[in-house]
Design a protein with these regions (language model features):
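Right-hand nucleic-acid polymerase module
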Residues: 1-127, 137-246
């Protein structure tokens, strides 16, 4: 549960594309504001990490061809990107480097690589920004070595649930040396979307007060259904009538 929840205007009663810019009248002023998670505290980041863990495990279930990577940025390239694109900040530079790399990949393959990556600051003397990630696809190693020109490349040939658990922990890792730094997720859209077509997802079908908003893990444990799946499975009516559990 969020450590620092905040009040925001209820989007249901704000102008948007769905209501054609004419929102419905708010029947009760107490509904004008709703409580929302801050999205930045330790608990929020941990909850997001759990959601990503589930989604990547689902992706791996349907697409087991995946590799683990670590990519670094040498100082020369870091400064070059910083100056050329007039950007500041480790995460911004890493994001731009990733964008440029994927553009080179698309130029060669005519398509992008499905990926989930996160930034981290090094713990050694250089404290250099680097990127950990999981890529889905076949025969990627030579392509990566050909196109990533910014620094060191490490490639792990196997990805398991342990790998996913390891990499998602960077989302809420406590870094005493860099207490204000938060790793930035850089990823493809639709990771793990296959779950919504599985038989298990039918158990989440809206059923009033009896709606089951849980996801069953491989070990049998049940956790709250990740927000991504909740938004995919339920209609707007269902979302408004099924309370979001902490």
């Amino acid at each position: 549960m969020c450590l620092y929840p905040k009040l925001i205007l209820n989007r249901k009663y704000l102008p948007n594309k769905k209501n054609g810019g004419i929102p419905p009248k708010c029947p009760d002023e107490r509904l004008r504001y709703v409580t929302a998670a801050c999205g930045k505290c330790y608990e929020c980041r941990k909850q997001k990490a759990r959601g990503w863990l589930v989604r990547m495990e689902e992706e791996l279930r349907h697409n087991p061809n995946a590799i683990f990577i670590t990519l670094t940025l040498e100082d020369k390239w870091y400064k070059d990107i910083e100056k050329k694109y007039n950007i500041k900040g480790d995460n911004n530079v890493a994001t731009q480097a990733m964008r440029l790399w994927l553009e080179r990949v698309r130029k060669i393959t005519k398509k992008s690589i499905k990926h989930w990556c996160i930034t981290e600051l090094g713990g050694n003397d250089t404290e250099r920004i680097h990127i950990h990630g999981i890529l889905w696809g076949v025969g990627l190693e030579s392509l990566i070595r050909e196109t990533w020109k910014y620094g060191f490349i490490f490639i792990g040939q196997y990805v398991t649930e342990k790998t996913i658990n390891y990499i998602t922990k960077y989302m809420y890792k406590k870094d005493e040396k860099h207490p204000t730094f938060t790793g930035k997720v850089l990823c493809s859209a639709g990771i793990g979307s296959q779950y919504t077509t599985r038989a298990d997802a039918k158990n989440n079908k809206y059923n009033g007060e009896n709606t089951k908003e849980t996801y069953r893990c491989k070990n049998g444990a049940k956790i709250n259904l990740p927000i991504y799946y909740r938004n995919k499975i339920y209609t707007e009516y269902s979302l408004n009538n099924v309370p979001l559990k902490p």
